[in-house]
Amino acid sequence: MEPRDPSPEARSSDSESASASSSGSERDADPEPDKAPRRLTKRRFPGLRLFGHRKAITKSGLQHLAPPPPTPGAPCGESERQIRSTVDWSESAAYGEHIWFETNVSGDFCYVGEQYCVAKMLPKSAPRRKCAACKIVVHTPCIGQLEKINFRCKPSFRESGSRNVREPTFVRHHWVHRRRQDGKCRHCGKGFQQKFTFHSKEIVAISCSWCKQAYHSKVSCFMLQQIEEPCSLGVHAAVVIPPTWILRARRPQNTLKASKKKKRASFKRRSSKKGPEEGRWRPFIIRPTPSPLMKPLLVFVNPKSGGNQGAKIIQSFLWYLNPRQVFDLSQGGPREALEMYRKVHNLRILACGGDGTVGWILSTLDQLRLKPPPPVAILPLGTGNDLARTLNWGGGYTDEPVSKILSHVEEGNVVQLDRWDLRAEPNPEAGPEERDDGATDRLPLDVFNNYFSLGFDAHVTLEFHESREANPEKFNSRFRNKMFYAGTAFSDFLMGSSKDLAKHIRVVCDGMDLTPKIQDLKPQCIVFLNIPRYCAGTMPWGHPGEHHDFEPQRHDDGYLEVIGFTMTSLAALQVGGHGERLTQCREVLLTTAKAIPVQVDGEPCKLAASRIRIALRNQATMVQKAKRRSTAPLHSDQQPVPEQLRIQVSRVSMHDYEALHYDKEQLKEASVPLGTVVVPGDSDLELCRAHIERLQQEPDGAGAKSPMCHPLSSKWCFLDATTASRFYRIDRAQEHLNYVTEIAQDEIYILDPELLGASARPDLPTPTSPLPASPCSPTPGSLQGDAALPQGEELIEAAKRNDFCKLQELHRAGGDLMHRDHQSRTLLHHAVSTGSKEVVRYLLDHAPPEILDAVEENGETCLHQAAALGQRTICHYIVEAGASLMKTDQQGDTPRQRAEKAQDTELAAYLENRQHYQMIQREDQETAV
């Protein structure tokens, strides 16, 4: 199919904005035809030229695959279509349609270029949108202009125009011009350095939004023949579903010939084994090309999990994968997608959400009876996530690059997970006096993957669930939720509502009656556990030794562990203890004589007197995150004793991490050395953690020689400094999966979220390093007037009184600007309270950056305080200095929410804008090539 010529409007002289795409075009000044070298191939692309030696591509009507004819009834141009933020699966879906999200990115010029940008003519600045799949940014009013420059997004499907739907096809690159580009040129190996990149209009790179390869935008690096080369789909080619597999089907025509065929085949259809789902017409069909090297992936994201984590992570997957393999579960669930991809060989699934999301997908797979069932990996969002912990995926998503997650899914081991049936029926022997009007005869779920429990824990969960249903506005804060849980648990303990549990139940396991044993134990909670983890990571079965009658717990052995909890063992569970082991069995018959709170995988209810049978349902196929293998082992397998590693340990504060973790060199410079540890060469991080925690306990150790080191907090974690283009945190639950040699070279970095204060930074002003003189410079003896007060208290008083000169004098004399009062309020807190702009500016300029996000005893930062007081200028100072707008106080409020409560709508709008900008900055940097 020959490419069409660019429209006259596309022949522009705008050299400041251009695009090169397998479905797009380039724009720039027309070079003289006799001087412009052309590609020496049979196929020519009108408008494609070289402009001297500066640019590789400057203007193009390039169409590797001419756009398919428009679907009847579908809008023709981008401007006539609605602005979509989701993938269009209807028959009118546009070829190469962008997926737009709102953005506050201000450093990127509008992609359509100055000639076609309509926003510059508007009186106010226009909002911008960013395509999640190809990362271009345009003004919202300019989206329709993309049609004029003939630029489309990377195609996610192909048309079924040929009778041979399995005709050999390949994917072409989708080249896009970039004004900013990280990484190095694939041809020359040099970086894309450019001065003043934030406001530059210069095109510095050409990159493919499929394989992420990037080249300098000059003819010496990017050759014209590369435009038509097949794309490898990049490092994740094994999991990316190529657009050539996805065909848009044509709706059958009701012609006379077709109707005769329909009548002739009607008897066949009556005897067909296809279900109604399989037989109905769909706009898109999947025609895979099987390959033993491929593990095609479907990603299901629950956007409601983990706050807004789910909604944000969808955008990252749209960038790395084909948008038609990423599904938002709030748009209809997983069934349609699984039906459509059911015939794809070697399929894998990534469930992004909590354990409930995983259970939803597993139940859908049961209903569809896919053979073989695709293995399911987990990206845990939110809290809890005991199944994800069991399979080594961790207790929650922190900031691991999506690219690394895709690699883990591809390389993960396939394991089995027992799933258990729950059958409940009313107990006919229960008397009418035992009936409870608030009880139900049905369980919330009829299958469980994690656990089934009754008693104390189910009662607390049920109280929380019912209270949240009645007053959802009171449960919008994680802190409040925890406080409610604690209060409910304490009141339930005092009332003893579950102390007589053993009197009202009968438990028979594999034909053995455990009721007498349970009545002797008098547990307040009984758990039937399938996996080792329970209650956000605890291990209630523990590790039975060889002298016990029990086996270690497994999630694939066809056995349930039955555990009883007294109040003592429940308390011990949180500090590494375990419950009372009752038995391991294959079948349970549980009879309750009265209404009792129960929960199934965290879903609670009050179940009327019932007979409950628990038996093995089936085994689900899961993906377990594999332990990483060192690419360069430090010793050969023949060595009996591992080589010893001597590694420097350096600590990073949370403020420095949030500000600099995309810049490795700056973050390394900001780190504070703790000392040196010596570990075996094959150590994993669990073993290394023990050595680091002993570091400061040794009186003669390296840690003791560092006078500025504060003790490590209990929440510190390792940072991976080698396997990605930036630093990222390693979940503590996954430390046993990572070797020391894989995350560090000569130095290992750890993140301490509670590291705060002047002593964390060795380069702070001291009495021996005076500041430059100022009009407020003290005269000899000028500081003696307040000698009765300690220097720290004098600083506090100076901030309270708005005494700028006094504050400067004290600082020059060695005063600690990170000093706090008895309520943990910093000098900046006091300066904000008095509204002293001069003192605030001085503290922001001279105090260490940790002061920005320092919290007082109520959890408030100085920005929370300024927002609540409506101090707009001070808020601006603090935000521009780099304060986090996403920190919450003890009420769960961000600074923006504090401004809203103060009814300052303009300030709230400003803070919301800057908060969104902070989030977008992180996302943009995370997609660096």
UniProtKB/Swiss-Prot annotation:
Biased composition (Pro residues): 764-778
Gene3D superfamilies assigned: 2.60.200.40, Ankyrin repeat-containing domain, Probable inorganic polyphosphate/atp-NAD kinase, domain 1
Region (Disordered): 1-46, 59-80, 257-281, 421-441, 760-783
Biochemical pathway: Lipid metabolism; glycerolipid metabolism
Motif (Nuclear export signal): 362-370
Basic residues bias locations: 258-273
Listed GO biological process terms: diacylglycerol metabolic process; glycerolipid metabolic process; intracellular signal transduction; lipid phosphorylation; maintenance of postsynaptic density structure; negative regulation of Ras protein signal transduction; negative regulation of T cell receptor signaling pathway; phosphatidic acid biosynthetic process
Motif (PDZ-binding): 925-929
Coiled coil: none
Subcellular location: Nucleus; Cytoplasm, Cytosol; Cell membrane; Cell projection, Lamellipodium
Gene Ontology cellular-component annotations: cytosol; glutamatergic synapse; lamellipodium; nucleus; plasma membrane; postsynaptic density; Schaffer collateral - CA1 synapse
Name of this protein: Diacylglycerol kinase zeta
Origin species: Rattus norvegicus
